[in-house]
A protein has these predicted regions:
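PIN/NYN-family metal-dependent endoribonuclease catalytic core
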Residues: 3-4, 12-65
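Acidic, PIN/NYN-like endoribonuclease modules and their adjacent C-terminal/linker elements
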Residues: 44, 100-164
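Acidic, metal-associated active-site segment
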Residues: 76-91, 98-99, 119, 137
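Short active-site oxyanion
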Residues: 7-8, 27-29, 86-91
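Acidic catalytic patch
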Residues: 56-73, 97, 149-150
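Short hydrophobic alpha-helical runs that function as membrane-insertion/retention elements
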Residues: 91-94, 112
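A generic structural signal for short hydrophobic patches within well-formed alpha-helices
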Residues: 9, 37, 99-100, 117
Length: 164
C-alpha cells in the first residue's frame, strides 16, 4: 500500500506526472486520508485530481483515520497520513521535513520528492533529460526548491548511488 500526504500528491498533479507515481510503485491505488482529501479540495490542483477518484486503475482512495499518538504540532493531514501508514505498514509519500522525521522515528518508510526522483534515476525509469524536465516543472509550477547539491546529483550523468 502507498499512502500519500497532500504536498507530494499536489506537486505531481500540478506537473501532470501522477501516472509516473503509480508506475514507479507498480500500484493501481494510492491511499489518502479524509484530511488530505479536504486539503486537496481547497487547492487549485483539485480539478486535475478528480478523474483519479473515480478511475478503475490509477485510483486515489480515501480512508477515514483518526490520528493517534502523533504530535499536535504537525498538521492534521500529516498526522492522519502517518497514522495510516504506520497501521498498514505502508510507504508514505510526504515532503514535509518535520513530519517525515517523526514518521521515520516511528518506523514509517517516508519517500520525499528528491528520494523519489533519485529512485527513478537509479532504476532508469527516467533519463537525465526527463529528470531535468520534471525538476523544471516542479520549480516553475509548484515553486519547489531543491538543494543545489541534490539537483546537481539528479541531473548528473556521473551520479553514483551513495550506498555503492
Amino acid at each position: 500500500m502507498i499512502v500519500s500526504d497532500t504536498d507530494f500528491l499536489s506537486s505531481f498533479a500540478k506537473i501532470d506526472e501522477l501516472k509516473l507515481v503509480f508506475r514507479v510503485f507498480k500500484t493501481k491505488e494510492i491511499v489518502i486520508t479524509e484530511s488530505v482529501h479536504n486539503e486537496l479540495k481547497e487547492a487549485p490542483v483539485f480539478d486535475l485530481l478528480l478523474t483519479y477518484f473515480s478511475a478503475k486503475e490509477n485510483k486515489i482512495i480515501i480512508k477515514k483515520v483518526s490520528a493517534k499518538d502523533v504530535p499536535e504540532n504537525l498538521g492534521t493531514g500529516e498526522r492522519e497520513s502517518i497514522t495510516l501508514a504506520k497501521d498498514k505498514r505502508a510507504r508514505l509519500l510526504m515532503d514535509d521535513r518535520d513530519a517525515g522525521k517523526y514518521a521515520e522515528k516511528v518506523d514509517v518508510k517516508v519517500i520525499d520528492i528528491p528520494s523519489f526522483l533519485f529512485y527513478c534515476k537509479e532504476k532508469k525509469i527516467l533519463n537525465t533529460s526527463q529528470l531535468k524536465t520534471i525538476i523544471s516543472k516542479l520549480k516553475s509550477k509548484d515553486f519547489y526548491e531543491f538543494k543545489s547539491a541534490v539537483e546537481k546529483a539528479l541531473v548528473s550523468d556521473n551520479w553514483i548511488p551513495s550506498y555503492i
